[in-house]
């Protein structure tokens, strides 16, 4: 009965996310076994701060500037200060880099991140952020290199051996999560008073929501810890008299949250009340694209996953949904 080691541990009946603006999210999870609040809180915090991928400027080239210790006529800040300001530009980028962005501005006035001319899959999240200030008649042109990565990469590691003269490497702050704190309190479940309640506050740069960041971090931990599981769980035997002949493929009883979709795709399906694969395959492509926040990228991802199972969108499923769908899903879970 090795399953009792994990099956009989209490799991949170409440996992609640509350957003406070665009960049801050609170998470409450309770009840947890005593000690698990600290275990999970510390593990999630470390992964959130160190292991999530993001985008950042890795280098900048400024017309007329050969190195970071220069000054520019008509610009109040020196190049060192400008580079420090460039480090704070918050960026969301789809796909991999490197990508190029250009900024051209004439004075007088402040030069902000919103003045940068971005390419289609790059978005500036803090357009009001000031990069430098121009005097009357001054002009500046910059070209930025943007890439994806994780954690913090110092400027000297962003310096390519064949870099042209005037290309200034920048410290890259890739992590989309800027700050994480947590606390553990006592909570009760029935008559038991010594369970844990975990409360976390996650602050991001806006390129990812706090809820998605926690989901990514949990998936990383799941992937790493799974390597230590050195056994197969015993299969449940279904009595012959309980086996019912279905009019459809039992795989349709599998829940869509088991498909390992991206967080965006999974959330779109959840918001559209699509629970089982049988619900999903009856949707047409046009119906899916009308789902809020569901785009062509998510559609292609779902089509690819379904194709690997021999399924596709727009299928007709007889006798769907069955009245006892939850019971059937549990009965057939070992068959798919």
Swiss-Prot record:
Its EC number is 2.7.7.6. SUPFAM superfamilies: C-terminal domain of RNA polymerase alpha subunit, Insert subdomain of RNA polymerase alpha subunit, RBP11-like subunits of RNA polymerase. The keyword Kinase does not apply. The keyword Transferase applies. Keywords: DNA-directed RNA polymerase, Nucleotidyltransferase, Transcription, Transferase. GO terms for cellular component: cytoplasm; DNA-directed RNA polymerase complex. Pfam families: RNA_pol_A_bac (PF01000), RNA_pol_A_CTD (PF03118), RNA_pol_L (PF01193). GO terms for molecular function: DNA binding; DNA-directed RNA polymerase activity; protein dimerization activity. InterPro entries: DNA-dir_RNA_pol_insert, DNA-dir_RNA_pol_RpoA/D/Rpb3, DNA-dir_RpoA, RBP11-like, RNAP_asu_C, RNApol_insert_sf. Residues 1-232 are annotated as: Alpha N-terminal domain (alpha-NTD). Transmembrane segments: none annotated. Residues 248-336 are annotated as: Alpha C-terminal domain (alpha-CTD). It catalyses: RNA(n) + a ribonucleoside 5'-triphosphate = RNA(n+1) + diphosphate. GO terms for biological process: DNA-templated transcription. HAMAP family: RNApol_bact_RpoA. Homodimer. The RNAP catalytic core consists of 2 alpha, 1 beta, 1 beta' and 1 omega subunit. When a sigma factor is associated with the core the holoenzyme is formed, which can initiate transcription. Belongs to the RNA polymerase alpha chain family. The N-terminal domain is essential for RNAP assembly and basal transcription, whereas the C-terminal domain is involved in interaction with transcriptional regulators and with upstream promoter elements. DNA-dependent RNA polymerase catalyzes the transcription of DNA into RNA using the four ribonucleoside triphosphates as substrates. This is DNA-directed RNA polymerase subunit alpha. It comes from Chelativorans sp. (strain BNC1).
């Amino acid at each position: 009965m090795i399953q009792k080691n994990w099956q009989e541990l209490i799991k949170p009946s409440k996992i609640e996310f509350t957003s406070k603006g665009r960049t801050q999210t609170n998470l409450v999870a309770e009840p947890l076994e005593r000690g698990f609040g600290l275990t999970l809180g510390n593990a999630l915090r470390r992964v959130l701060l160190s292991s999530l991928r993001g985008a950042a400027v890795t280098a900048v080239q400024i017309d007329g500037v050969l190195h970071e210790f220069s000054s520019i006529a008509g610009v109040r800040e020196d190049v060192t200060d400008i580079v420090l300001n460039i480090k704070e530009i918050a960026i969301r980028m789809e796909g991999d880099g490197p990508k190029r962005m250009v900024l051209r501005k004439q004075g007088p006035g402040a030069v902000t991140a919103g003045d940068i001319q971005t390419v289609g899959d790059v978005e500036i999240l803090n357009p009001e952020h000031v990069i430098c200030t121009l005097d009357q008649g001054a002009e500046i042109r910059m070209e930025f290199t943007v890439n994806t990565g994780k954690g913090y990469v110092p400027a000297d590691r962003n310096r390519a051996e064949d870099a042209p003269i005037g290309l200034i490497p920048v410290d890259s702050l890739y992590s989309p999560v800027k700050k994480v704190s947590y606390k553990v309190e006592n909570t009760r479940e029935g008559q038991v008073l010594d369970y844990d309640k975990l409360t976390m506050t996650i602050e991001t740069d806006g390129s990812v929501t706090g809820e998605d960041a926690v989901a990514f971090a949990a998936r990383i931990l799941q992937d790493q810890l799974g390597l230590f599981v050195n056994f197969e769980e015993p299969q449940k035997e279904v009595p012959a008299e309980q086996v019912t002949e279905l009019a459809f493929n039992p795989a349709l009883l599998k829940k869509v949250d088991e498909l390992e979709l991206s967080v965006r795709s999974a959330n779109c399906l959840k918001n559209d009340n699509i629970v089982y694969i049988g619900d999903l395959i009856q949707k047409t492509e046009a119906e899916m694209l009308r789902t809020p926040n569901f785009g062509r990228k998510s559609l292609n991802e779902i089509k690819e996953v379904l194709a690997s199972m021999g399924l596709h969108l727009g299928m007709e499923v007889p006798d769907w949904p069955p009245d006892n769908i939850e019971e059937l899903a549990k009965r057939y879970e070992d068959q798919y």
